[in-house]
Structure formats: structure tokens, C-alpha cells
Amino acid sequence: MGRFLSCVLLTLSLPAAAQAPDWQLISQSRSNDQLVYWYVDASSIVRTDEYLRALLRTSWSAPQYGPDQTAYQSSTYLNYFDCGKRMIAYTGNTYYRNIEPVGLPVHEEPEQPLAQLTFQAVTPGSAGETRLDFVCKFRSKQFMT
């Protein structure tokens, strides 16, 4: 009976562990006397039709304020990457009070269908280019192994 219970508990814990984000810090910068950190959840990178899709996160060392003056210190969002054309589309922003995206969000913007998204060319040297380079290189390494 004890062995059975252990197996049940182990099985119940697996989905949660499999879904835990694998945040990889890909860049940081200084802006207005604060640090800005950009992360990619490496476990979320998947191919969707001709694009790569990944969950990203931005965190700030000091609170930011939305239009209604709600404070937040991190946001997560979905990016679609066209590696060949070097373009990105964004959707599904979720904002959190703390530097880690945990707990209840303070604001959420719904994910839009891929067909409704606008792809934008990345600016050389920008955080967008860093995200695109990381995701496209990371995924190509995964396909080669």
C-alpha cells in the first residue's frame, strides 16, 4: 500500500514539474537608473506552422506603472518568430506585481490568434534581435541533436 501511494504521489507531481518554466536570462540593460532583464522559457520553444513560438519575460529592478497607475515589475508574453525573415509578433501580455512572475497577475491581455498578429522586423542591436537570435539558434540546436 505504501509503495502504491508513493507511485500515485510521484505521478501527480510530474505534470507540475514538466510545466515549470525554464527561464534563461538572455540579456540585461540599464534604462533610467534601473536594470531590465529579458528571459526566454526554453521549455516553451515550439514550432507552430512556419514560426517558432516561445514564452518570454521582462523584469525590471524597479516598479513600472500601467495607464491606471497599477504597479508591476515583470511581464510575460508570447512571441512568434519568423527566423528566416527576422521578424517577431507579440501577444498575450500578463503583468505581475513582483520581479518573478508568480501569484495573481495585476493585468492580463488575451492571446490573439496568429492570423491577427502583426509581424515586425527586429532592429539590429535591440532586445528583440537578442530574443530572435536566442530562440532561433536554440531551436536549431534542438533539431540537430
Predicted regions and their residues:
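N-terminal signal peptide c-region/cleavage motif recognized by signal peptidases
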Residues: 13-17
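N-terminal secretory-pathway/extracellular module detecting exported/lumenal segments
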Residues: 18-145
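Sec-dependent signal peptide recognition
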Residues: 1-9
